[in-house]
Amino acid sequence: MGRLRFELRTSRLKAGCSTAELATRARLGMPFTAPSEVITQVAGETGGCRTMVMTGSKPWPAPQIDADAWVADSAVVIGNVRMAEGSSLWPTAVARGDLEQISIGAGSNVQDGAVLHGDPGQPVHIGVNVTIGHRAVIHGATLEDGCLVGIGAIVLNGVTVGAGALVAAGSVVTRDVPPGTLVMGAPAVVKRDLPPEAIEEQRRHAQRYARLAASHAQITP
C-alpha cells in the first residue's frame, strides 16, 4: 500500500471525546479510498462525538458492526464488512472489505494479526462459532460453522472449509475441506476425521473467546 497522508481536523471536538476514540470510529464506520489517493479525515456528528470520515473518489460501503461485537483498538475494519453479535476482531487483525464483502458470524473470533480479504466475486464468509488463529490469512474463502483455522494457516480463494473442520497451524489450503476433518500441510491434505468431542471443543473454544471479548469490551455477553 502506498504511503498515505492523513489530516485530522479536531478543532471542533466535543468535550470527553478522545483522539483514540476518533481513531476507532474512523476504523469502524467510514468509507475508505484507493491507496494512491490522499485521504482527508473530516469530522462529522455521530453519537455525541465528531467522527473522522475517510473521503475520496472511491468510497466503499461502511462496515456494519453489531453493538455486541468487539473490535480491538489496533484492529482495522475497512469497507463492506459485517460483524454479527458476539463476534470479535483482536489486536492488529485486519478485515478489508474494499473489493468484496466480508461477513463474520455470531460468536466467531478473528485473532491477533489475522487478515481477511477477498477478490471481486470471491467474498469472505465466516460462519457461527468459528475460530481464526493468530496471523492466519483467509482470502476469498468460506469457513462454515464451528471450524477452526490454526495459527499462521492460509486459506485461499474459492475454498470452503466445512463445518467443524480443523486446519492445522501453518497449513496452506487450496481445495475444499470436508466437514469434520483435520487437514494439514502445504498444500493441505485430509489426515483424519475428527471425533465428535473434538468438534464440540472447537465450538466451546469459540464461545470462550466470545466471553473473553466481552470482558475486554466491559460488557455482559
Labelled PLM ranges:
Residues 9, 29, 51-53:
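Residue-level detector of intrinsically disordered terminal segments
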